[in-house]
Amino acid sequence: MQMGSRLQCSRSRCRARYLCAPASMTVPITKKTLTEEAKAALKRLAVQQNPRVPEASNERPEVQQTLINTESGSPLTAFAHLDAAVPNLESSFLDLRDPMTAPDGTTPTKPQVHRLTAGFALGALLFTAPMAALNSVLIPQTISRLSGTDRVTDLALLSVVGTLLTFLMNAWISVGSDHSYCPLGRRTPWIIAGTVLTATSVAILSACDFMPLVIVFWLFTLIGHAMVSMPLAAAFGERVPDKFRDRADAWRGVGQAFGQVLGIIAAVSLTWAADDSGWDGTTRFAMMVFALCLVVAGVATLLVLPFEGSSSYLPREGVKKGDYFSQYRPPKGAPKFFIAFAARMFAIAATSGIAIYQWYLAQDGLGDVSQVAMFGLSGAAAVMSVMAVAAFVGSLLAALLLGRIARAFKDSRIPAIAACLLFVVAVVLPLTPIDRAMAVALYALFAGFAYVVYDGVSQGLNLATLPDVRSVGRSLAAFSLANTFGSLIGAVVCAIAIAVTGEYLLIFAVAAGCMAIAGVLTLLLK
């Protein structure tokens, strides 16, 4: 026993002496003491870590579908929960991975899932409202004040340039945010910078009385908005687990749709003296208000969303020349893809042409609308409010019934073509002798319903035209060009019709023709 206790005390003294020894003496073996053969043996036994480079956001199907719905699709389509999911071979439902794990590798807790759903819905609402106000009301008012009789031509030119710039910026920002490595993550820095740029540009825009400056700062506004919308769409596809993506997508769509209505009503309410030169009740004041709203949108969205993890540790890969636009190449050996592409392009043209010139239509294209009243507003402001609310009600009703409508027909072309016919009937109503204000309200109601049905049931038809399920993300990126081309066609053709005839009502005839072409092309899909 005495010998054992002495041995134990000796070991304790040795351990204490080792712990108290200098750092240089605590490492008995260093690399210098190993032979080259020993180093090679250790290297063979060590586990070689080869971390995978994260998938590019412009190749993720969920990201592309989110962008399509955000830019020119119907946001309430996701609220219908149609069984037409975008195929994705990376989905956890196709293997034994936990569906609670997001594509970025994180596993959010239940409170974090609620924060993700609320954050993306709130971001969609708060960012959509100012942009809807600017696009539909404030920019047309500013151009009308500065251009006078040339306002339609100038607005068409600004719309064309803005659409092309947005396309280029989306391609650049998607690659730039994918290759951002910092403690704040890949998407958060872009959202912060985009919010600052957008709010600053709108604030400066409110003080511009020179048309070239208006064009410059409006384009800066679009750049800033692209810096927000593209990273938000990428974050939505990466951070929301597969199990909860449908619910989060539905609430994001509701937020975007409600933001469109709220933005238009707020804009016309704040500009009851739009043509005056002061600040009270003018376009200048409204722009300053929405510039502050953009700041609130950025701060609130980032605070509600769980903080994004650091991207500093991610494996880095250089940017290649083809990374920017290679995803826009259409799939080979898919003739039906081009038919579906053209159908969507003309459907977008039918809706975008009316949306661009809607303020001028309400102001000068419907005759005497001074008796129209809603929400304490009258005249053109009331007409804009009525159309916004009617379109929202029609879209919401269609979203609630879309599941039943889609399941009632084995051939998805039948409800899609029926929706095209209903849309054509809706846009013809303002051309009839009935009361113009009532006609545009009915148009907004029926057209909102028809477009949601068409957008929802045509998704399955469009996905069926894609030849390879392994490249759905790239195919959807190419398909998203239909939004760009459709917006260009709608802006240019409607501007030509107004300039030649001087009648704003002819934009409804253009819309009817475009949607009729979309219906015929949809009939060719199978």
Regions found by a protein language model. Name each.
Residues 192-209, 421-435:
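C-terminal ends and interior cores of transmembrane alpha-helices
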